[in-house]
């Protein structure tokens, strides 16, 4: 966030200074050194004035925000500056070497550096990057032009040289493209119908609203160090200025440059810099992978060389910014200024960020030429094509490391709320007040989380809350990659890891290399479509032995190198069964070579000498039994240092990742895959949420309670008619049974009469001791009541003694019989004494 506009008092004082002529060019005060201006086609000598409330004062080390007035190009420019607190981390490191070649490390105090960034008042989307250590030295980017400013040598009046950047004379630098392509691109840049750079900025920021951060590491070679008088402090300050300029260029794409480290080869160059640019680049990225990246984490490393390569300004890999093995570039820093050199580094770093050359494409940047012009024009503006290329990289999940916002302990220690970097003491930083209006998680005025928020940014943060442990935050991209998961207590996704280089893949026909399974068929299909496949070995030998642009094994100096027979499979890729033209957005040159009954297809993308050709065989490709391609040579696969003992270390239930830790299969637990678990590794994060069982419990309740109940309800609804009928039938049967039971208990019912001797036994009429019912002979009465016949005297205990029942209420049959007592049958009981003889009734005849 820059300083505020001038107060009325300051504006009045400014007009007074202008009226007195104190801010105009001071040509008579001093003359520029010829060596300082010989490379400039035009310039002005100016005296910047620092704006304060009362008087001009010297720049102090504690100045966080300053403003200057510059009168140049017939206009008055008021620039507002603030110290670039994002430029250097608190743990900024400088590596050097002693005379014995031993590595030395130093953490210089950079908390009070004098490198500033800012803007020009009244100029929309302007950017300023200057060093105020000894005068003002840096760049001013206006609407459609860029200017340089630097102190005038031997001046005692604070005089400076102010010059347009496109007016610098320099040795032509090229990237190997034809003049026709360069002229075509230059013509396109002059077309008036193209939108302004302001419109470009608005459009890009709408597409890429999330800021990316490039953690840059710079390496300076021995010759450049000697050229600077073997002064480590001077080299360090020069590279910090370089990083500040880069930051001012990339900010238009919403990309920030953070210089995380510097290495100066003070004793000797640890790599061979003899040969062509491709050779040196290959040597540098191999050294980086083996030594530098193991010492200090970074996203891209750029080598600064004094040596030139026949007019080639530099070289870098395309789209490899987060790669462990290819995220690097080389840059020639000869007899040019740091401001001019910044455009070269911005160009090569742009290749790492997925940007191709603008040549031959409909590109515009609001200037005559753009940064990604292959002619290394010294422009300060990125084109619409560069923005689109970077957008494609991000949409294809490339550059994931750029979302790694520097953590508070890695950021510059002087906090600045509103710079979109989380400084020490801050929990979040949403930027300007306007940007914070749409941030739901962060309080812009305090850079603290809102009361309900757990986080405000990161791959494992959603709706201001941590994603649950086990949530995948980085998916698996190939059979040689592994996924990463959130841990439930951090907004950051774990660092990207993959299966260790050298692990067999594609049914043991290839090796894993940097997270990809490298084999010829896959490379042919990427270029020529899904039906293409690798050509026979004879094709590789015949084509790559020629040593031209369509068949070679890299460069030897500025010339193509012929492939030896043993290295032919590591040169230009040769394919057959080609039915589709290349699927790349850039149309390459295609060559077809007949060879022994087949057609060998190859391509040359003409990307320039600063970009490795995608038509070459990929490094890590299996070129023979136990061998891989490395730097255009077929070498033993032992260079991959694969040492994973799957059976011993991972117990046969996992593989080793790039950190040489076991990544376990599903069902086994890290770190050694010897116990039951959920898979993953100590590097990937938990593959499940060990603390939360809500999902599991919910599923159990759903499947074992809710689902059965719903199924039962559906069954009952479908069978409701049948069930209703069955229920009615059962109820009717039960009712009938009760009615029959009631009828059986009716008094005087002849059907239930029993003889005294037991159930279902009737006695002949007129027998001894049997009374006859009033209804006629042959009808027996129930025993036990009055009028029940008893055995005659003298029979003793021949018959059981009846038990008399309680008196029952009177019954009224349809045909009333005479009143009769009712007794119940008691079965065969043995009385304790003989019962009295029952009374005898005579029939009513």
From Swiss-Prot:
Subunit structure: Interacts with SH3GL2 and SNX9 through its cytoplasmic tail. Interacts with ITGA6.
SMART domains in UniProt: ACR, DISIN
Cytoplasmic compartment residues: 719-845
Membrane-topology descriptor: Single-pass type I membrane protein
GO cellular component entries: cell surface; cytoplasm; external side of plasma membrane; extracellular space; plasma membrane
Main location: membrane
Pfam families assigned to the protein according to its UniProt record, in alphabetical order: ADAM_CR, Disintegrin, Pep_M12B_propep, Reprolysin
Keyword set, alphabetical order: Cell membrane, Disulfide bond, EGF-like domain, Glycoprotein, Hydrolase, Membrane, Metal-binding, Metalloprotease, Phosphoprotein, Protease, Signal, Transmembrane, Transmembrane helix, Zinc, Zymogen
Annotated S-S bridges: 322-401, 363-385, 365-370, 473-493, 644-656, 650-662, 664-673
GO molecular function, one term: metal ion binding
Cofactors named for this entry: Zn(2+)
Ranges in the topological domain labelled Extracellular: 30-697
Catalytic residue positions: 348
PROSITE patterns: ADAM_MEPRO, DISINTEGRIN_1, DISINTEGRIN_2, EGF_2, EGF_3, ZINC_PROTEASE
Modification note: Proteolytically cleaved in the trans-Golgi network before it reaches the plasma membrane to generate a mature protein. The removal of the pro-domain occurs via cleavage at two different sites. Processed most likely by a pro-protein convertase such as furin, at the boundary between the pro-domain and the catalytic domain. An additional upstream cleavage pro-protein convertase site (Arg-56/Glu-57) has an important role in the activation of ADAM9.
Annotated TM spans: 698-718
Disintegrin domain boundaries: 414-501
Regulation of its activity: Synthesized as an inactive form which is proteolytically cleaved to generate an active enzyme. Processing at the upstream site is particularly important for activation of the proenzyme, whereas processing at the boundary between the pro-domain and the catalytic domain does not appear to be essential. Inhibited by hydroxamic acid-based inhibitors.
Residues annotated as binding Zn(2+): 347, 351, 357
This enzyme's EC code(s): 3.4.24.-
Pro residues bias: start-end ranges: 783-794
Name of the gene this protein is made from: Adam9
Annotated EGF-like domain residues: 644-698
Gene3D superfamilies assigned to the protein according to its UniProt record, in alphabetical order: Collagenase (Catalytic Domain) (3.40.390.10), Disintegrin domain (4.10.70.10)
Effect of disrupting the coding gene: Deficient mice appear to develop normally, are viable and fertile, and do not have any major pathological phenotypes. In adulthood, 20 months after birth, mice display progressive retinal degeneration, disorganized retinal layers and a degenerate retinal pigment epithelium.
Name of this chain's protein: Disintegrin and metalloproteinase domain-containing protein 9
